[in-house]
Amino acid sequence: MKVRRNLLIALSLLSISASAQRIKGSDTVLPVAQQTAERFMNQHPDTRVTVTGGGTGVGISALLDNTTDIAMASRPIKFSEKMKIKSAGEDVAEIVVAYDALAVVAHPSNPVKQLTRQQLEDIFRGKITNWKQVGGDDRKIVVYSRETSSGTYEFFKESVLKNKNYMASSLSMPATGAIIQSVSQTKGAIGYVGLAYVSPRVKTLSVSYDGTHYATPTVENATNKTYPIVRPLYYYYNVKNKEQVSPLIQFILSSDGQDIIKKSGYIPVK
């Protein structure tokens, strides 16, 4: 009996040490989630963490369906999503793991250096259609956006468009990387991406919300709040799984985890 009890204890410990966790959702959070998960697995070799994107809405839907343990989100969970969880007798916890600046990007050859929030609203709503209307070349503006399931799509709509609708002819991209690629190949293009995705292939534009003070999207400007388009990034998990996910969440909030976040182009919470 004692041998059997010891065997059961050993098997229980093995199942804990060899635990697997699934993280799914926001493409904005994806790069830093992958990096922190890799470091976590290096420190805990018996733990496997899988990280996949798809968008905030996809991640939260997966959390509702119990096909992920943690949902990455670049927007707060919606009331309707919370109600679905509560109707199933469950509860969800929210953790802010980082902050992100949303950069407005254009083709590198574009001479325009800055735009106001109102100009951005008019561009993404189709009221401004040519770059010459904002001091640029006589060239049609090609608007790239994220698809509607994206938290970045919803945040940009809320912060920049003041909850007005995007123009019907904007080109919806399935992932942030697709916006970078499309904007880098299209001279009249404009789009928006998380700061960590910015590369020399595109040009970032300075933005002003008051029409006077312009700021470029950098970690420093986002941290000191001179750059206006900044939002929190979230991890959501089912409260009943707290014990399982806590070690990973504690790691991303630790000094090591927050250091990874800062080096990756995000703004730490601590």
Roles of regions detected by a PLM:
Residues L11-S19:
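Hydrophobic h-region of N-terminal signal peptides that target proteins for export
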Residues A20-K270:
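Exported/periplasmic ABC-transporter solute-binding proteins
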Residues M1-L8:
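Bacterial N-terminal signal peptides that target proteins for export
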